[in-house]
Amino acid sequence: THWTAEERHYITSMWDKINVAEIGGESLARMLIVYPWTQKFFSDFGNLTSSSAIMHNVKIQEHGKKVLNSFGSAVKNMDHIKETFADLSKLHCETLHVDPENFKLLGSILIIVLAMHFGKEPTPTWQAAWQKLVSAVAHALTLQYH
């Protein structure tokens, strides 16, 4: 993926402002609520019986933070996203058997959550840069799938 200076700016300047625990936890929780079939991959995370239970589930919050921290690797290695996510792709494909479509869903949710948290800052150009990034990460995470 080729990145323009403007795209890099939109991504890195926003990343520096992100509260990873808050945004990550909220993004993962929202994905599980909006797309309930994704909950099957988190059956050992405790109570997922309601939106409130999911939003306040400590394991979901912690895993969301972990997911967004790993997403930060893409921000730091924008020119090497495929290599950066090779091991995670293998894990999600061979061990966890995650539906690769879920990576796109979570990326879309992340953009929505960022837009909610940062108000008017996310312009259409900002959104285009972030969409390109989440798409690149989702693609990298699917490379081990056949």
Swiss-Prot record:
Superkingdom in the source lineage: Eukaryota
Record GO terms (molecular function): haptoglobin binding; heme binding; metal ion binding; organic acid binding; oxygen binding; oxygen carrier activity; peroxidase activity
Alphabetical keyword list: Heme, Iron, Metal-binding, Oxygen transport, Transport
Tissue and organ expression note: Red blood cells.
Annotated ranges, domain Globin: 2-146
A Gene Ontology biological process term: hydrogen peroxide catabolic process
Pfam families, per database record: Globin
Record carries keyword Isomerase: no
Family assignment from sequence similarity: Belongs to the globin family.
Quaternary organization: Heterotetramer of two alpha chains and two beta chains.
PANTHER family per the UniProt record, alphabetical: HEMOGLOBIN FAMILY MEMBER, HEMOGLOBIN SUBUNIT EPSILON
Name assigned to this protein: Hemoglobin subunit beta
Source species: Caretta caretta (Loggerhead sea turtle)
Taxon lineage: Eukaryota, Metazoa, Chordata, Craniata, Vertebrata
Gene that this polypeptide is encoded by: HBB
